[in-house]
Structures are given as structure tokens and as C-alpha cells.
Amino acid sequence: MLARAGEVGRAGPAIRWLGGIGAVIPLLALVLVLVVLVIEAMGAIRLNGLHFFTATEWNPGNTYGETVVTDGVAHPVGAYYGALPLIVGTLATSAIALIIAVPVSVGAALVIVERLPKRLAEAVGIVLELLAGIPSVVVGLWGAMTFGPFIAHHIAPVIAHNAPDVPVLNYLRGDPGNGEGMLVSGLVLAVMVVPIIATTTHDLFRQVPVLPREGAIALGMSNWECVRRVTLPWVSSGIVGAVVLGLGRALGETMAVAMVSGAVLGAMPANIYATMTTIAATIVSQLDSAMTDSTNFAVKTLAEVGLVLMVITLLTNVAARGMVRRVSRTALPVGRGI
């Protein structure tokens, strides 16, 4: 036993060294990706300027014609790019997905943990994990062939015809479309995000200690009061983390959105049913044509778009970590306030 303890003691520095390397590698990878994107996008950043974030036009110019040099950057004649519709489409579809997915996921996790028999709860939990692993292209195909047309023919017309004509809500009015657009994209993203949030939240609820819950019930609380006063405060910061995981999936999803969004560039969506596109879907759909640009300016612009998406994701995660800390400080410790 002493010999083994000595061996472990001698291996301690090596384990710490390997652990330090493992901790640094993700940070180095993130910095490397950022540096590569910035270097690749530098010409586009310099030429596109701030109007890149306010303009709506997406025009690669005459990629087979003459080229011009502006501010030291070569580009095709007529090339002009604006990313505002892409940013709006990305944020709007992610917001729609979370508005639907968060209550559904948390509610489903609560029902599984609180109401279902143990064996059935385990079976449903396994199904949720399997749903989280479905390839996005399969979900996108289902959305394009079945879900999108169903929404366009049966759900969207009801919403469009009954939505009040008042600011903000009038965005729900208009032509329901043919099964492609912002609403369908957001709903498809919600289908993909629900298993992620629900699985994580389900695991969190299962980790809540039994004694505080039993104490709350012994004091006369109903099951709902126990959930509200004990279970949710215990896992509140974890739920925020689960939502961030889902948001990251929604922001970066590519194939499913490309198949149901309509992939329309250069136009702001007029209503929630309008065809549009997102940053990730644009990078995929435009990469082939960008490679035909002999000046490489189109590729540089796509790199700038990718950099914008990465910055949005990083800012979202930083904000979420702040929310987790705030929720952790303000949430009642289990047992207080019961």
C-alpha cells in the first residue's frame, strides 16, 4: 500500500501537468480560430466597414469580370455586402426556438421526474437522449417535407388572420407562405433544442436531494409549492446553463435551417412567415459561389460573417455566465424560506 501511495505521489506532478495542458488546449483552440478568422476577414472588414452591419444588400458583383482595388483590397466590380438580414434571421429564429423550447423542456423534465413511474421515466429519458442525437439534416428534411407544409396550411393561417393589428403583434400578420420561412425555421430549431434542454434539466431535477423535498411536504406544501420553493431554486443556475446549450445549438445550426428558411439573401423579413436565412446557413449556401471569386473577397466576407457569429456566440455565453452567477446568488438555499 505504501509503495502504491509513493507511486501516486510521484505521478502527481505529471497528472497536474497533463491536466494543465488539457485545460489550456480549448482556450488555445478558441484563440486560434478567432485569429484565423480575423486574418482571413481583414480585407472584408476594412472594405465593408460599419455599413456591413446596417446594409441589407448581398451582391457579390461580377466575379467573372474585371476587378478593382479599393483601400488596398481587390474585389469584383459591384461587390457590396450587408449582413443585417443574416443577423436578424439568426437572432429571430433562435428567439422563437427558445420561447417554445424552454417552457416545454422544463415542463417535460418536471413531469418525468415528478409524475411518471420510475421505469416509464427512465424510458422517456432514454428517448429524449436519442432525440438529441438525431442528425440535423434528417430534422431539416422532415421540416421541409412534412412539418413546414403542415404549419403553412393549418397553423400559420389561423395566427395570421387572428393576430391583432397593433405594433409588434402585427408582425404575426401577413401571407403564411408555403412552408418555408422564419416561423418554420424557429419551430424546427425548437424541435432540435427541446431534447438538449430537457435532457440536461431532467438530470438536474434528479440531483435535487430528497430530504429538503420531504421536509417541505411535511410542512404542508403541495407538490407544486415544493417544486416552486425547493426544486427550481436548487437547479435554477443549471437551467440557465441548459438554456445556453440550447441557444448555442440554435445559433449555429446550419443544415436544418438551410432546408426550411428559403435561403433568401438581401432582404429583411416582412413578417414572421417571410423567407430568410441565417449566418450559418449563408456560409454553407454561398461558399461554393464564393470560391469562384478570383479576388477571394467573397470568401473574406464569409469569414467576416463567421466572425460575427462567433462573437455573438461568445457574448451570449459570457452574458449567460453572468446570469448563472446572479441566479446562484439570489436563489434561496434549499431549506430557507420554506
Curated annotation (Swiss-Prot):
Segments passing through the bilayer: 19-39, 93-113, 123-143, 144-164, 181-201, 232-252, 254-274, 295-315
Query: PROSITE patterns this protein is in?
Result: ABC_TM1
Q: Which terms does the UniProt entry file under GO BP?
A: phosphate ion transmembrane transport
| Ranges where the ABC transmembrane type-1 domain occurs | 87-320
InterPro entries attached here? MetI-like, MetI-like_sf, Phosphate_PstC, Phosphate_Transport_Permease
Q: How does it sit in the membrane?
A: Multi-pass membrane protein
Report keywords, A-Z. Cell membrane, Membrane, Phosphate transport, Transmembrane, Transmembrane helix, Transport
Q: From the UniProt record, which GO molecular function terms apply?
A: phosphate transmembrane transporter activity
Q: Where in the cell is it found?
A: Cell membrane
Query: Could you tell me what induces this protein?
Result: Transcription slightly induced by phosphate starvation, part of the pstB3-pstS2-pstC1-pstA2 operon.
Q: Where is this protein chiefly located?
A: membrane
Q: Which GO terms describe its cellular component?
A: plasma membrane
Q: Which family does it belong to?
A: Belongs to the binding-protein-dependent transport system permease family. CysTW subfamily.
Q: What does this protein do?
A: Part of the ABC transporter complex PstSACB involved in phosphate import; probably responsible for the translocation of the substrate across the membrane.
Q: How does it assemble?
A: The complex is composed of two ATP-binding proteins (PstB), two transmembrane proteins (PstC and PstA) and a solute-binding protein (PstS).
Q: Which protein, by its recorded name, is this?
A: Phosphate transport system permease protein PstC 1
